[in-house]
Amino acid sequence: MESRKDITNQEEIWKMKPRRNLEDNDYLQTAHADEFDCPSELQHAQELFPQWHLPIKIAAVMASLTFLYTLLREVIHPLATSHQQYFYKIPILVINKVLPMVSITLLALVYLPGVIAAIVQVHNGTKYKKFPHWLDKWMLTRKQFGLLSLFFAVLHAIYTLSYAMRRSYRYKLLNWAYQQVQQNKEDAWIEHDVWRMEIYVSLGIVGLAILALLAVTSIPSVSDSLTWREFHYIQVHGRINFLTL
């Protein structure tokens, strides 16, 4: 009876079991959970933004190169040639020249693979042959390129609207007013400059609106509510795409 009581007592069995075996069992249970409970397909599906890696890298490289070129042209070159310091331009003016260049280049990368794919199909003589791996990967990331293009375009619009809030711009207005008084000019109106800026702003607003329309219709919940003809007209129709570009 005493031995049977010891055997049926769970606490005694736990104490009687060697510690090494307990650690081995814990290790096996952990290894079992890591190996079978989380397969490789699920681990791949849980990666952080896998389709955004390539577009973000390309956008970062383009933005860095464009920033360096603009910095050399707008700041370093005047400093080296005429000893004029324009470092105050870096936070707003230099950045605002980088944003539209990157945005329009990313937008071009959205529609360029479609043209390349058509050329490849003509070269192969059929549309049922698989595309090269690099082209297939590029076409799968067109949505991400388009959203990044919209992101840089919105930033460009915000930076442009902030021009009038800069302290340097206010000082320039005072200098222009003083120069106008010194030159005895009652009216500083320049017709072609006015028309040029009005057209620039108008086309920028229209382009941003169309780009936002394309981005909204690419959302799955919105695209599912559209018919195939409506989606094809907005996303694939060449006139809207090239008008945006």
UniProtKB/Swiss-Prot annotation:
Belongs to the STEAP family. This is STEAP family member 1B. The chain crosses the membrane at residues 52-72, 100-120, 145-165, 199-219. The keyword Protein biosynthesis does not apply. It comes from the Eukaryota. InterPro entries: Fe3_Rdtase_TM_dom, STEAP_metalloreductase. The keyword Membrane applies. It is found in: Membrane. Coiled coil: none annotated.
